């Protein structure tokens, strides 16, 4: 090989290496996308969500005016949520309303502001529950509150702090500072 040919090959090889280096350097300078974890992953208006149990029966329905989902926390926030629970026969049993709600990945629904739980079946002795904040396990339908709770039944009203109950079994227990009033119906006998 002649000296001139060697020099041409060396110069061309160096030129190729320089071009590869420049190309690699340009790729490193690309702007990285900045993700703000305070922004929701997605937003939705006027949502209607139906959730079914593993057997395929309707478990609950969750309607909201506005929903924001945060994927980094696996949390959904609902504005003006209305939850309707269903029994095994697909009959609506309870309606739950609040100002805001947070649904976590473990299917816990945290309700905030003007929480109201209303019975939708006529045979329930417990007709309505009101409180400021509550938590509902959407799998077991256990409901709890650490705030002042008022229970309205067919023949009683009861209020107290801290409540534990279960929507499926239609019961609620007030834990502290309980005050109850009963309506006693007089039976009139005919002489």
From Swiss-Prot:
A GO cellular component entry from the record: transporter complex
Positions of disulphide bridges: none
Alphabetical UniProt keywords: Cell inner membrane, Cell membrane, Membrane, Transmembrane, Transmembrane helix
Main location: membrane
Taxonomy, superkingdom: Bacteria
Subcellular location: Cell inner membrane
Effect of loss of the gene: Leads to irreversible cell damage, growth arrest and an extreme sensitivity to SDS.
Membrane topology, as annotated: Single-pass membrane protein
Transmembrane segments: 7-25
Effect the entry attributes to changing residue 153 to R: Impairs LPS transport. Fails to interact with LptA
GO molecular function annotations of the record: glycolipid transfer activity; identical protein binding; lipopolysaccharide transmembrane transporter activity
GO BP terms in the entry: Gram-negative-bacterium-type cell outer membrane assembly; lipopolysaccharide transport
Assembly mode: Component of the lipopolysaccharide transport and assembly complex. Interacts with LptA and the LptBFG transporter complex. When overexpressed, can form homodimers in vivo.
UniProt family annotation: Belongs to the LptC family.
Additional notes on this entry: Interacts with the LptBFG ABC transporter complex, but does not affect its ATPase activity.
Function: Involved in the assembly of lipopolysaccharide (LPS). Required for the translocation of LPS from the inner membrane to the outer membrane. Facilitates the transfer of LPS from the inner membrane to the periplasmic protein LptA. Could be a docking site for LptA.
Protein name, as recorded: Lipopolysaccharide export system protein LptC
Lineage, uppermost ranks: Bacteria, Pseudomonadati, Pseudomonadota, Gammaproteobacteria, Enterobacterales
